[in-house]
Regions:
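Long, C-terminal-biased catalytic regions of enzyme "large/alpha" subunits
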Residues: 1-241
Length: 241
């Protein structure tokens, strides 16, 4: 793939120079950073939005400079974190205590995402987030939360059409949980330890299937339990339609 073979004793990193490999600088918690300065409802404040864009622009400038200095390709990764959303928040709770709308939530928001507790329309969420990925060449994801829309697929198509030339990667989160005991299809109810069928209260991972967007990927938190902070974040999500 690199068009060359190393000689005995040569360092393997020679193959990765000239930007042939990527080192990513990830970030989470942009929502919380702006909340510390502008309050919890800053998403509609143009000054606050520009403040967050300046943060990611600064990260991008640093990675570009590192690429010139070291010869590798450095990129900014708008991270859909899994365990760090819990770990970083716990560390800050130890240092700063429970700060309203920041550490008090027990999780940090992924990358540049809109506060999951709020319910903008899918179009408003896309419009808010679309300005960040240009500074996140290492990867990113947008997503919107929906109720069951089996009888209204045109609603999803309207969002997809709107997103087509505005964002590069859009996840669609619709409830597809299933209980094999009572036959329920829909969305399971979050509990302190996981999720349960709202109809028969079943929570046995052997007899139910629960699908949630854990970070960037879709996971089954009943079969593979997630960290506390991510569970709280998923349980806090509201629908955008």
């Amino acid at each position: 793939a690199f068009g060359q073979r190393l000689k005995d004793g040569e360092a393997v990193d020679l193959l990765f120079k000239n930007r042939r490999a990527t080192v990513s600088l990830g970030y989470i918690g942009l929502y919380e950073a702006a909340t510390a300065f502008f309050g919890p409802n800053w998403e509609t404040n143009p000054e606050a939005k520009e403040f967050t864009l300046e943060i990611v622009k600064a990260l991008k400038a640093h990675t570009d400079a590192w690429g010139d200095e070291y010869g590798y390709h450095f990129s900014v990764y708008a991270t859909p974190s899994e365990s760090l959303t819990d770990r970083f928040c716990k560390l800050d709770i130890e240092k700063f205590g429970l700060v309203p709308d920041i550490t008090e939530k027990e999780y940090y928001t992924n990358s540049f995402h809109y506060d999951v507790r709020k319910n903008p329309t899918p179009f408003e969420k896309i419009d808010f987030e679309k300005d960040y990925p240009v500074f996140s060449s290492g990867g990113f994801i947008h997503y919107c939360e929906y109720p069951v829309l089996r009888q209204n697929p045109k609603a999803l198509e309207a969002v997809w059409d709107y997103a087509y030339d505005r964002v590069g990667y859009l996840g669609t989160n619709t409830p597809i949980d299933h209980c094999y005991k009572c036959g329920y299809d829909g969305e399971f109810t979050p509990t302190a330890k996981g999720f349960e069928c709202p109809q028969c209260k079943n929570h046995d991972p052997q007899t139910c299937d629960v699908v949630k967007r854990t970070c960037g990927y879709l996971g089954n938190p009943q079969a593979r339990p997630m960290v506390h902070g991510r569970h709280v974040e998923i349980s806090s999500r509201v629908k955008h339609m």
